[in-house]
Every structure is written in structure tokens, then in C-alpha cells.
């Protein structure tokens, strides 16, 4: 993973090409059909096969050129977790997205799958009626399949490039006005806290960042990842394993302590305030920002004030521009922002926004 913090960035260009080829795996015939219709509704995606269990999925991957597998967890014959390593071994570069219910068990298995090679997850509605009415689920499914499919092709020599995804194309237009001059990293900057924002592709990126950093004992770490409730609970557990640091969802009113990771809980914005000379965590259900709750911007705005700008921000892979406004407030207050580079980002939206702004 690369972080952009100095020099000149020259955004690349994209070309139209073949649709992302998908295998849908679910033991329910009805759910397979609904997932297939949802994905096939986008011209940039083609469902080339479906399977009712992990063993059948492995057979399909051997027969077909597939970019992305949407993989159910609980199935007869062979479940998703058993099939996962065999699918990855059968076709190097294959992107596997776990389809999980919004339960503690489902979230736990999904995070475990990501730590074992899956690239992402989609929280799956529990009934056909929910899928038919859940526009958010459909958008999430399509965007993740296209993002990961395109990322897999970029990293795989000799394969056809993916048809560009509309949000990504918009970002290209926004950021392709010429070379971008970035700020130099201050040599004597000493932050009092670290803040990380991420979205699509974030869990994988977060695990890598914390594995590389190891224990951070002299400051707190604040993480806002676009993720639903329950999943953020499990994310915190995996960040603790990756970093060797205590990590948990933030609790409203708890004092901030150095050497801990605070994760924004799903459906809550996470902020920090100074009260009685100490820094205190706060959670709120104020309206979503950038269509997200939790959002990165509220966290960064609060940190710019609470820490008088002594904040180091890492903006990791993610769609949209959440965190760009908050990052400007951090920089204006004297803080520093580093962004994941385009080559290693699944979606260069959030890091691209701060990079293009020269932050």
C-alpha cells in the first residue's frame, strides 16, 4: 500500500472495455436469481454463472473466466469459509466478496474471511422482499463488484480492463485537470493523535496499516470506516489482533486514552471534545454527511479543535469525498494529511479528493 504525501501526482486515464464477469453463489435459488438480476441490470457487469454451494462454485471457477465471486457463507455440501481458500487458489487474482446477514455471527465470519483472503463483504437482506425494496443494498452490491473487479484487473497482467464505473469516471473528470502539486511532509511534525478514514476496500487496508505500524503507545487512534452496526464491533476486534493494541467501538462520554484504537460505531458519528481539561468521546445521530453515518468529516472537524491541529490523518481507499472538508480543517489548523495512492486503492475517491486539493 502506498501513501501519497509529497511530489506530483499525474492521474491516469481509463478506457471502456469488457464487463466485470461474476459468479453468484447462494444456496437459495430465489436469492441467486435476485442477485443475478440486480447485477445484470448494470451494463458494466455480466453474471456468467451461479452455484448453490461452495463445491459447485469451485467447479464453475475452473470452467469460466471470472473476475468476482459473490459468496454466501452458510450453504450445504460446502460452506463459504471452506470454499474461500480453494477458490482463491484455483484462480489467482480472483476477488471474493462475502454476502452476509446483518448479525453478529455473520459480521464475525465476514471479517474473518477478509483476514483470510476475501476482499470485502455485502450485508445481505434476510428476505426476498427486503432485497426487492433495498435500493441501498443494490447500490452497495453493484459498486463493490465493479470496484473490486476493476481493481483485480488492474493488478492482473494481460487481462482486459474493466468498463469504468460511473462514480469513478466522475472522479477521473474531476481530478484529470493536470498534475497535482502536493504539500511536503513537515520534518518536525509531532502529532498528538492519529485519525484514519476509509470506505470501500477499507477493512483490508486497515489491517495492513495496523500490521505495518504495530503498537502505537504514545497517542490515541481514531478510525471511521463506512460500515453498518454490528460489523464495526467485529472490525474493532480484528484491528486489535492486527495491531496488538486495545481496540473497541467508542462509547459516548468515555475519556480518551493514549495507546487505544477508537472505532466509530455503525450508524453513529464519532467526535472528540475537550471537557474539564480532558478529551472525551462523543457519539451522535446527527444527519448523515456525504450520505454516510458514521462519516469522516465530523470526526476530523472535532479533532482539529480538540487537538489544536496536532493531528495526523490517513485517508485510505473509499468512494466519494467524505473526509475532504475535514482534512482541510486539519491542515488549516496545522495538521498533516497522508492519502493512499491511486495504484493501491480499490476506489481512489476519498484519498483522491484530498490529494487533488493539495492537502
Question: Where do the protein language model's features map onto the residues?
Answer:
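Conserved acid/base catalytic micro-environments in cytosolic active-site loops
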Residues: 1-23, 29-44, 55-70, 74-359
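Short beta-strand elements in bilobed, periplasmic/extracellular small-molecule ligand-binding domains
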Residues: 46-48
Amino acid at each position: 500500500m502506498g501513501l501519497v504525501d509529497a511530489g506530483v501526482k499525474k492521474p491516469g486515464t481509463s478506457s471502456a472495455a469488457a464487463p466485470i464477469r461474476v459468479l453468484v453463489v447462494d444456496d437459495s435459488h430465489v436469492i441467486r436469481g435476485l442477485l443475478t438480476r440486480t447485477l445484470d441490470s448494470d451494463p458494466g457487469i455480466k453474471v456468467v454463472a451461479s452455484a448453490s454451494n461452495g463445491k459447485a462454485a469451485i467447479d464453475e471457477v475452473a470452467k469460466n473466466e471470472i473476475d468476482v465471486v459473490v459468496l454466501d457463507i452458510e450453504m450445504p455440501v460446502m460452506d463459504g469459509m471452506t470454499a474461500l481458500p480453494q477458490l482463491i487458489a484455483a484462480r489467482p487474482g480472483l476477488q471474493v466478496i462475502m454476502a452476509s446477514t446483518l448479525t453478529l455471527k455473520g459480521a464475525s465470519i465476514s471479517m474473518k474471511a477478509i483476514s483470510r483472503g476475501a476482499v470485502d463483504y455485502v450485508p445481505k437482506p434476510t428476505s426476498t422482499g427486503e432485497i426487492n425494496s433495498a435500493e441501498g443494498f443494490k447500490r452497495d452490491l453493484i459498486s463493490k463488484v465493479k470496484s473490486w473487479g476493476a481493481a483485480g484487473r488492474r493488478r492482473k497482467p494481460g487481462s482486459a480492463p474493466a468498463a469504468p464505473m460511473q462514480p469513478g469516471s466522475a472522479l477521473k473528470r474531476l481530478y484529470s485537470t493536470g498534475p497535482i502539486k502536493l504539500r511536503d511532509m513537515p520534518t518536525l511534525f509531532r502529532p498528538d493523535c492519529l485519525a484514519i478514514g476509509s470506505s470501500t476496500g477499507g477493512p483490508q487496508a486497515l489491517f495492513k496499516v495496523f500490521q505495518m505500524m504495530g503498537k502505537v503507545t504514545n497517542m490515541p487512534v481514531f478510525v471511521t470506516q463506512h460500515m453498518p452496526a454490528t460489523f464495526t464491533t467485529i472490525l474493532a476486534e480484528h484491528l486489535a489482533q492486527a495491531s496488538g493494541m486495545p481496540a473497541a467501538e467508542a462509547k459516548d462520554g468515555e475519556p480518551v486514552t493514549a495507546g487505544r484504537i477508537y472505532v466509530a460505531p455503525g450508524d453513529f458519528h464519532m467526535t472528540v471534545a475537550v471537557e474539564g481539561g480532558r478529551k472525551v468521546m462523543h457519539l451522535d445521530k446527527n444527519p448523515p454527511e456525504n450520505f454516510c453515518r458514521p462519516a469522516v468529516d465530523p470526526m476530523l472537524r472535532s479533532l482539529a479543535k480538540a487537538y489544536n491541529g496536532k493531528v495526523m490523518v490517513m485517508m485510505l481507499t473509499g468512494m466519494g469525498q467524505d473526509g475532504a472538508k475535514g482534512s482541510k480543517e486539519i491542515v488549516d489548523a496545522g495538521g498533516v494529511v497522508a492519502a493512499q495512492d491511486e495504484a493501491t486503492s480499490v476506489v481512489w475517491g476519498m484519498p483522491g479528493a484530498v490529494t487533488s486539493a493539495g492537502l
